[in-house]
From Swiss-Prot:
GO molecular function (one): glutamate 5-kinase activity
Record's keyword annotation contains Transferase: yes
GO annotation, biological process: L-proline biosynthetic process
Residue ranges occupied by any PUA domain in the UniProt entry: 286-364
Catalytic activity: L-glutamate + ATP = L-glutamyl 5-phosphate + ADP
Protein name, as recorded: Glutamate 5-kinase
Keyword Cell membrane: no
Enzyme class: transferase
Signal peptide: none
Subcellular localization(s) per the UniProt record: Cytoplasm
The protein's annotated pathway: Amino-acid biosynthesis; L-proline biosynthesis; L-glutamate 5-semialdehyde from L-glutamate: step 1/2
PROSITE patterns xref list: GLUTAMATE_5_KINASE, PUA
Alphabetic keyword roster: Amino-acid biosynthesis, ATP-binding, Cytoplasm, Kinase, Nucleotide-binding, Proline biosynthesis, Transferase
Amino acid sequence: MTAQTSAVSVISAANRLVAKVGSSLVTNEGRGLDRAAVDHWAAQIAALHQQGKQVVLVSSGAIAEGMARLGWRKRPSAMHELQAAAAVGQMGLCQAYEAAFAEFGLRTAQILLTHEDLADRHRYLNARSTLFALLRLGVVPIVNENDTVVTDEIRFGDNDTLGALVTNLIEADALIILTDQRGLYEADPRCDPAARFVAHAQAGDAALEAMAGGAGSGVGTGGMLTKILAAKRAAHSGAHTVIASGRERNVLTRLAQGECIGTELRAVLPVWSARKQWLADHLRLRGRVVLDDGAVHALLHEGKSLLPIGVAEVQGEFERGDVVACVDMHGRECARGLINYSSADTRRILRQPSSQIARILGSMTDPELMHRDNLVVT
């Protein structure tokens, strides 16, 4: 990590971008949409379009707009009330963006996604194809989580995560996360005035996760840690991430012109195939298996499949075909993938050689608990 910037922003060379705009940047401090702010973002994205760049906008603001329309001053905690606010507010959010982009001769499209949409392989591919078609048509997709139908168990959790997943979905060159903070600091600048600003780092650097923490404003849901984890996700498709203040004048167009603004997190992690990204990011974890040191080494350094003999413990309940995390003896995740046996059967065959599976279970569907083609090292 360094406080020095590179000479030119990575955004200048990016042809396909995902820009995530937080609630605080499109609302009047949570009291409904700020139409001037919406117009401002539309103008900047229109300028990027004129440069030949394709842009997908991930925008928060539906719940805040719904709260304003319903006369609620405090964000509700009950899921059904949040969903009601989202249903009311999404109408206003789409209308505002449609009107704003129309001033520049651009059409918009509403894309509402849930985790289940991306967890299902066919729906994942359909969403991908639809977004590519919209971009080819010169349409600006406005993406948000479908808050009206999601539950706590299937939520993305925040639009930073959604932005990263969309970045991977469309193979974008870069992700821009706009927030109400300048970028990343080595400590919370609101508590430590001497905190050093981080202008440049590598996405996936473990030190970043250790530094980050705390929630953002009371309007949205994402703190700085979620942004760092989003950058790590995006890096696995080769996309760079910039975390910058949306309060900076014309921040998007200036980044596109090569100006270095905010924190730039470069993608240096191994680029995963589309299938590996889907396995790692879009499927819900159903449990964990604790591995001994030998099994961890085999997965990380030898590219081997996971065998029952290397499993020390099973945590949680899962079925064959679910996504399960592989963790070491200290609880650190090293891989995840599709499991070939249920949690009940895995408990019966752990610490056993594969040659004993048929004797213990009565039959053997696979010699591996997790085949190397169906797992990804994390």
